[in-house]
Amino acid sequence: MDLMSLTAVELGKKIQAKEVTVEEAVKAAIASIKAKEEKINSFVTIDEEGALKKAAEVQAKIDAGELKGALAGVPVAIKDNMCTEGLLTTCSSKILYNFIPTYTAEAVKRLEDAGCVIVGKTNMDEFAMGSTTETSAFGATKNPWNTEHVPGGSSGGSCAAVAAEEVPFALGSDTGGSIRQPSSFCGVTGIKPTYGTVSRYGLIAYGSSLDQIGPIAKDVTDCAIILEAIASYDTKDSTSVNRDDLKFTEALVDDVKGMKIGIPKDYLGDGLDPEVKSAILAAADELKKKGAVVEEFDLGLVEYAIPAYYVIACAEASSNLARFDGVKYGYRTKEYTDLHNMYKKSRSEGFGPEVKRRIMLGSFVLSSGYYDAYYLKALRVKALIKKAFDDAFAKYDVILGPAAPTTAPKLGESLSDPIQMYLGDIYTISVNLAGLPGISLPCGMDKNGLPIGLQLIGDCFKEKNIIRAAYSFEKTRELKRSTIAEEYSNKNTADTNKSAGAQ
């Protein structure tokens, strides 16, 4: 049996039933990663030794009856912008090529407490700045459905690892769509929770007012269970919200009768690929058949989301990334004349072009002559976008639309046109600006065999609504396996049959 073809919950059940040991699960993940990495490059670091050591510890706790949760013993991959004590954490940047944290991010720690085993850190756009996972200092990640295409970003490594069945699930972060857009491109399911639901402690910041950690998995059930495990109030994160409604698995009910679902007309206009539009409207019809009330409405302000986002996110990035100067950790230039020259050369050599572009943009909009004209104006637009969503959620339980305007572009297409790359997040960015929860899940395939993602958006702290709608829609479809996953599975079957024949 190919253990990595199972969902996290299915694998967890087999481990609890003693059908599979934790060591077997971890070894299966490591073997799968090693077999596929040359083709997709979804990992920056593979921690085989640490994972096997942890597997033995977790197995002992399971055998002693101390660990009984759904995720106990399940291998997981972590996006490389979350601190992991003693394990290299690079943000896919040259400037952090040798950074080993002395503490673990709260969300990661909660997974470890649940008995999950970290097998490695996944590739990403450098400092989460990008939508294709091509800005990584460690090379581009490829899409497991077609390796000539991008996996999306910035959590492209995590999404590709799940789609390729290297691991059952992974953690990603979402600042402007970085979980939902690559989930769409890779045909997996990903949730960006309400801002403040999952602790940002230990997440290396890009845009502090926008960043959120969330799960990436094969299906909605896994995502709900993982989100339940990582969501918590954390005093170490000043933006953490003390919620009492974190039982997200309660929403795993196939019932949308009477649910009011709105489709913004703004999401169906120019720039949306016809095949994507057709798949999204077909998904809406499926929910309608199940009893949901579906109608189109005018959301407004969508065209202002991208400029407002890039002003705010880049301003916050220019401040957050000022700490990387080559003094106490990370990359330091070899030759310099004085301290100022060392700062300048270390940052110039350590950061990639997209990161430098955003730092410069952020520094510009925060400068004294332009602060009011750009940054304050962007904050006002952010408030107006939140108001537009508030008005919509006074009428609707869920907003439905595409996760991305197209399916995955080819490698290199977006890098040559940064504006086009930014426009790829047009349907996800406003959700971050408003602090709302969103989920992306597969809803179809285009003529080239690339996945199309459906996005469901909920009101603040109403993750249960989007999980219920997503779960109900998912029941109308069969999960599909990526090309890379199928190839590996077929090869394993052929090898097994060949071995049996030889005997």
Swiss-Prot record:
GO terms for molecular function: ATP binding; glutaminyl-tRNA synthase (glutamine-hydrolyzing) activity. InterPro entries: Amidase (IPR000120), Amidase_dom (IPR023631), AS_sf (IPR036928), GatA (IPR004412). It comes from the Bacteria. The keyword Signal does not apply. Belongs to the amidase family. GatA subfamily. PANTHER family: GLUTAMYL-TRNA(GLN) AMIDOTRANSFERASE SUBUNIT A, TRANSAMIDASE. Heterotrimer of A, B and C subunits. This is Glutamyl-tRNA(Gln) amidotransferase subunit A. It comes from Agathobacter rectalis (strain ATCC 33656 / DSM 3377 / JCM 17463 / KCTC 5835 / VPI 0990).
